[in-house]
Regions:
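Phosphate- and other anionic-substrate recognition elements at nucleic-acid/protein interfaces
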Residues: 1-176
Length: 176
């Protein structure tokens, strides 16, 4: 089935690629490149989450409505989603919510007819962090090398940094 958009992005040549670091502390980054102006803009959003109170406990879930609004505000060419994997120290319900969020992201892409690619962390890190340690803090260092004006002041901004690097990896994979 051929995918068509009538919003005008084909005529401008703009490229919009999203990179997503899955999880409640993850983020969504948008790589926007306009070839004629040789301009690159990076936008980054925290993963939209809602807190749900169940008795005395509070849990988090991805806010699908806000996520869809964020996607709809960008005329996406392609989305690169970090392939979710549960960790051995994660509890069952935490792992379930994490994987549910991963499924929501894929479902929104399918529902909005935006092509997506799942990318293992080792894949994008090998390309984007070549010659560097692959620790969480290192992705912030790498983003600051590539985008000196990008503001990532907190150690907890590693999700944003990962999303930016995933979007850049996606752009490289697509030849931009």
């Amino acid at each position: 089935m051929e995918r068509r958009r009538t919003s005008g992005w084909e005529e401008t040549g703009d490229i919009f690629i999203a990179g997503i670091d899955v999880g409640f502390t993850g983020a969504i980054s948008f790589y926007h490149h306009h070839p004629d102006r040789k301009r690159l803009v990076m936008e980054v959003y925290d993963m939209p989450v809602i807190k749900i109170k169940k008795g005395k406990k509070t849990s988090q879930e991805i806010d699908e409505s806000v996520l869809r609004q964020i996607f709809a505000a960008h005329k996406l060419t392609h989305v690169f989603i970090e392939k979710a994997q549960t960790m051995s120290d994660q509890g069952i319900s935490s792992a379930g919510r994490y994987m549910c969020g991963f499924g929501i992201l894929r479902g929104i892409c399918v529902g909005m007819q935006v092509p997506y690619t799942l990318v293992r962390p080792q894949q994008w890190k090998k390309i984007m962090m070549s010659g560097m340690s692959k620790g969480k803090g290192q992705s912030i260092v790498r983003v600051k090398q590539l985008f000196p004006l990008q503001d990532l002041p907190l150690k907890s901004d590693h999700g944003k940094a990962d999303a930016i690097l995933i979007a850049c990896y996606g752009a490289k994979e697509m030849g931009y």
